[in-house]
């Protein structure tokens, strides 16, 4: 599959802006990215990693999140136990467990390599509880999204050759029929 990188940038931006807006993210919250550049390029996950594709996607997403004051956490593959690259400032502020690994294309993946290159002071953390996220290429980001997870159907379900899904989160509804609830900015009730 031959990708048009300008189109990839435009489509990435459209998808991520859609998910940011519909997930009702606020300044200071965390957004997870799961990315298989192999899937984006039309291959199988983990088999055809592309640093170029990873950098394009992470750069676009970082720009959109940064302009809104939202933090990015980039999930790695199972070879790094799905650890995440975040800014050191976030890890310190949230008292996250920092782990020692430097990602490469086949241990961490192209998204993590790009995050290490593009972030100000990147570190790997063992786990995180994020408010929303996007999964490009069926990498399974659910373990990093807080409860209650709300699936969002992206404006486009594909990016290149990759399947795209997204999750937001909302507070638990407790109390049953007698309870009243505040409005839900995600589902609009």
UniProtKB/Swiss-Prot annotation:
In which domain of life is the source organism classified? Bacteria
Q: SUPFAM superfamilies in the record, alphabetically?
A: TTHA0583/YokD-like
Coiled-coil zones: none
Query: Which Pfam family is one of this chain's hits?
Result: DUF436
Q: Which family does it belong to?
A: Belongs to the UPF0340 family.
- Output this protein's name: UPF0340 protein SAG0103
Query: Source species, please?
Result: Streptococcus agalactiae serotype V (strain ATCC BAA-611 / 2603 V/R)
């Amino acid at each position: 599959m031959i990708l048009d990188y300008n189109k990839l940038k435009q489509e990435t931006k459209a998808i991520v802006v859609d998910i940011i807006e519909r997930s009702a993210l606020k300044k200071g919250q965390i957004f997870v990215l799961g990315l298989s550049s192999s899937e984006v390029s039309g291959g199988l996950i983990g088999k055809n990693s592309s640093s170029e594709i990873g950098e394009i996607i992470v750069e676009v997403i970082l720009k959109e999140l940064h302009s809104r004051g939202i933090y990015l956490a980039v999930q790695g593959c199972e070879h790094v136990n799905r650890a995440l690259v975040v800014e050191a400032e976030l890890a310190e502020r949230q008292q996250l467990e920092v782990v020692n690994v430097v990602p490469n294309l086949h241990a961490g993946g192209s998204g993590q390599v790009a995050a290490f290159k593009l972030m100000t002071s990147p570190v790997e953390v063992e786990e995180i509880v994020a408010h929303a996220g996007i999964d490009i290429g069926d990498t399974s980001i659910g373990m990093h999204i807080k409860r209650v997870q709300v699936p969002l159907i992206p404006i486009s379900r594909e990016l290149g050759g990759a399947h795209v899904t997204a999750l937001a989160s909302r507070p638990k509804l407790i109390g049953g029929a007698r309870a009243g609830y505040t409005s839900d900015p995600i589902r609009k009730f």
